[in-house]
Amino acid sequence: MSHCTTFAEAGRLVDAGRRAPFLLTLCEEDENELHITICCAKAEPNAQTPSTGNAALDDTLAHCTPLSPDENAKIELIFENYLLYQVRNESYCVFDADEVRSGTYLCTFERSQLLDYLPRAIDVHLIPDGTDAPASRKHYGIYTQNQIIDIVAPSEPTRHLRISYA
């Protein structure tokens, strides 16, 4: 099954699983067209955790469930004309309380350091709609198990968002 939805609806779908998704692919297919495929995380309920030799750690791990990619629940996002994107190692990212975002794993930002930095990184006067107004661009964040992907684009990947369940 496959259907199109909005970035916010896809975010609610991922949020419902209460686990960060996994990044499967990130590539540029056509000129300035960014393709990102993520999949939901699934618990491995019968996984055995080996003993570490540390009783306190073993007790903690006994209450944990390993996660793995659920390739039956994929989300493909295609940004047709991005302005900037970056991939960060999630282990080294910091939370900025001054940023204004909505969403948990698929986020949109009203205010962010990346949006503030944008005029220093690109010529904002060349943005496709001909304006350098902040409303002409949006910051999207994709928070996966191991990466934080930030995309600034003039429009969201609405009609190119595909959710498939095998």
How would you describe each model-predicted region?
Residues 1-166:
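Surface-exposed, interaction-prone regions used to assemble/regulate multi-protein complexes
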